[in-house]
Every structure is written in structure tokens, then in C-alpha cells.
Amino acid sequence: MSIYDDIFKQFPMIDEWSDSDEKILVEPYTYLGINTAKELPSMVTKAFNHWYQVPQPALDIILQIIGPIHAASLLLDDIQDDSDLRGGNPVAHKVYGVAQTINTATYVCFDAYHKVSQLTPFLKSPETTDLWSIINDEIAALHRGQGIELYWRDSLMCPTEEEYLRMIHNKTGAIFRLPIKLLQALSSVDSPPDCFPLLNIVGILFQIQNDISSLSPDFTKDKGFCEDFSEGKFSFPIIHSVKADSSNSLLMDILRLRPKDEATKRKALRFMKDQTKSLDHTFHVLCKLKKTAQEELEKLGGNSELSSILERIQVSPTPEIEDR
């Protein structure tokens, strides 16, 4: 007897979704191997809860929301940047293919989105608090920032530092703001302090720190040597270098080539270090922003957990970068 002889009996079977199906679907996400508890957005979220005092069960749900969204953004970033390595391993789309990795990234985002309803019982005023708008607004901001950055890269248009900071505020800032806005909505404190000026600085700090770290040999084993040159990406130090000596087209010419060889990338790095002093400028900016963040933290009464996170920001050149 064919299954088509009584097709209506097949519908319950068709609707079934097994654990083995789920495992297959999320394999690129699982392969990424992220311990979300140790990822920066989760660590910052837990530190900021010092001011919001959200109960642990609700905090756990928030972490279950931001973890997959952050991971999905990394999966998509690697595709859009045509990266080869992450954490020293081949990127997910080189193993599972672009199509499956995109599908997985989209799926885990929707899966995280479904968890938002689990936060409703913790709301003081569920009828006036729209948690879904928080998620939608920040995911939209993330895509806006990413889209502008891709536009700069693909059109070989170097932004100003101010434009770059606005892009970071959207792309990187959204990953930090999303969980903190959820904390704010669920806060057990009647009048929590305004932590968002500090939070926005933290997002900028860690993005610029990542930009300068990507030029360090220590980063090679994780992502490859100076991959921003290979990707044609306008990172913070690269932007400064292009703008600092507009009469010299060396760096723009190298970015146009998107070189894979180390010799060309070392030449670009040497130009940035010696000619335009862009590494020194970047560390100077990091030092100034870190000081501003620490001052803002003091105004909020201090937070030992967040202070420890800020100490991870390196504000002076490493010997390895200096040797370059």
C-alpha cells in the first residue's frame, strides 16, 4: 500500500520533528563550539545585572537568548568576510557549506526569539512592556551596522572615524544593548541607574580592541595573519592610516588587492606603524576611552565584575606589534 493511498494519515508524521533532525539542523552552530557563558556579551550581561538585580531564572533565559544570536552573527560574519579560520579551526561554512550555515544561523535566531515569551511571567507590567520590540530594534541595528560596513568594503569607500564609531554603535553595540535592555525591562529595582552611556563605551572599546588585536601575531592562530587586509575591511587603525596620509595610496591599493600573502600584508602593517603611526593612535584612543569608561563606572558606584572585564582592554602596544 502506498503512503499516498491515504495521504491524510501522513500529516501527523510529517509534522514530527525528532532530536536527530534537530542535531543535523544545528550542526554548524554546534561546530562553532562557543561556550556562551564565557563569551563577552554574556559576561557583560551578568556584570550589568549588578544594577538591575534580575532574578537568576530570568537572567538565565536572557543569556539563552543572547548566546545564540551572538553565535549566529559570528556564523554570518565569517561568510560575509570570506574568513578561513575562527578560533584556529576552519570556519563553519568551509565545513558545512554556505547554504546550510546561513540556514542554521537564521534558525538559531528564531529559536532564541521564541524564548522571549518565557520572560513574560517576570514582568511587573506585561501589558505595557514589549520585549519583542527590544529584540527587533537591536537585531535591526545589528544588520544596519553590518550592512554599512559591507558597503564600505565592497565600494572601497573609507569612512571617517566618526562614521566608523556610528557603525560600531549599531553593529557591535546591539549585541551588548539587547540583553541589557531586557535586564532593564525585568529589573527588580524601582529606579535603576542609567547604564547605557557606559555600555555604549564598552561596545566601542571592545570593537577597537578587536581591530588592533587582529593586527597582532598572537591573533594569527585564531583568524590568520592580518586578515583585515585580505578581507578589504576598514577597521579603526586602517581608517586612521588612510585618512592620515591621503596623498599616499599604498594602503588603499593593498586593500583593493585583498592580499593573501604575508609579505604584502607586512608591508601594509609597517606603513601603518611607521608612516602614519596608526597603531599608536589606536592605543591612544583605547586609553582615553578606557579612562572614560572607568570614570563612568565610578559615577555608578563601582562594579568589581565589570572592572575586571575592562581590565582586559590593552591600552599599550605589545612587543610583538612593536617588532613589526
Swiss-Prot record:
Gene Ontology molecular function: any one:
metal ion binding
Q: Where does Mg(2+) 2 bind?
A: D77, D81
Which UniProt keywords are given for this protein, alphabetically ordered? Lyase, Magnesium, Metal-binding
Q: Which cysteines are joined by disulfide bonds?
A: none
The protein's matches in InterPro entries, at most eight in alphabetical order, are given as: Isoprenoid_synthase_dom_sf, Polyprenyl_synt
Cite a single GO BP annotation. isoprenoid biosynthetic process
What Gene3D superfamilies does the record point to? Answer: Farnesyl Diphosphate Synthase
Question: Could you say which EC number(s) this protein's record lists?
Answer: 4.2.3.-
Which cofactor is essential here?
A: Mg(2+)
Kindly state what the record says about how the cofactor is bound.
Binds 2 Mg(2+) ions per subunit.
Q: Which positions in this protein are listed as binding Mg(2+) 1? A: D77, D81
What is a single Pfam family found in this protein's UniProt entry?
polyprenyl_synt
Origin: domain of life: Eukaryota
Q: Which CDD domains match?
A: Trans_IPPS
EC class, as a word, reads: lyase
Reaction(s) this enzyme catalyzes, per UniProt: (2E)-geranyl diphosphate + H2O = linalool + diphosphate; (2E,6E)-farnesyl diphosphate + H2O = (6E)-nerolidol + diphosphate
* Similarity comment: family membership: Belongs to the FPP/GGPP synthase family.
Functional note: Terpene synthase that shows monoterpene synthase activity and produces linalool, using geranyl diphosphate (GPP) as substrate. Also shows sesquiterpene synthase activity as it is able to convert farnesyl diphosphate (FPP) into (E)-nerolidol.
Miscellaneous note of the record: IDS-like terpene synthases originate from a geranylgeranyl diphosphate synthase (GGDPS) progenitor in fungi, after the split of Melampsora from other genera within the class of pucciniomycetes. They lack coupling activity and act as classical terpene synthases.
Output this protein's name: IDS-like terpene synthase 3
Protein's gene: ILTPS3
